[in-house]
Amino acid sequence: ENFRYIEKDSVGSDDLIYRTVSYVSGNFRKKFSLEEMAHDLGVSKYVLSRVFSKTFHRNFNQYLNDARLSYACTRLVNTSDTILNICLDSGFDSQRTFNRVFKERYKTAPSEYRKNKRRNAISSGRIPRKVDRLS
């Protein structure tokens, strides 16, 4: 009985938010644009752009870079992979772009971040688990 009063827009909006998060989570390691994502989700790029700004309070590129950086940070701390391999595997086009975006977000270089996180883990007795490769 109460379900009759739920507005279609709110349900559709929640569904689009879920599909947006799911899409980025499943594809951030690949190269794709807002336009491609909108096409794949069956919405206009303007609608999708509003989802990012209203729901996540950042634009598409910022949201995508956050997902990529989060993955890269895990790899930096838990693997011995090169920074180049990590940046490319995280979806960045180049190490130069990766370094710039990383420094903007964390105020340090990826190599320093790795050193500091490992040093902190060792000094606190929490040795990071070594992983050859995350999939």
Segments from the language model and where they lie:
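An amphipathic alpha-helical interaction segment
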Residues: 1-8, 12-19, 47
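Short linear motifs at secondary-structure transitions and domain/linker junctions
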Residues: 5-8, 37-39, 52
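Terminal helix-turn-helix DNA-binding modules in bacterial transcription factors
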Residues: 18-26, 31-36, 43, 53-95, ...
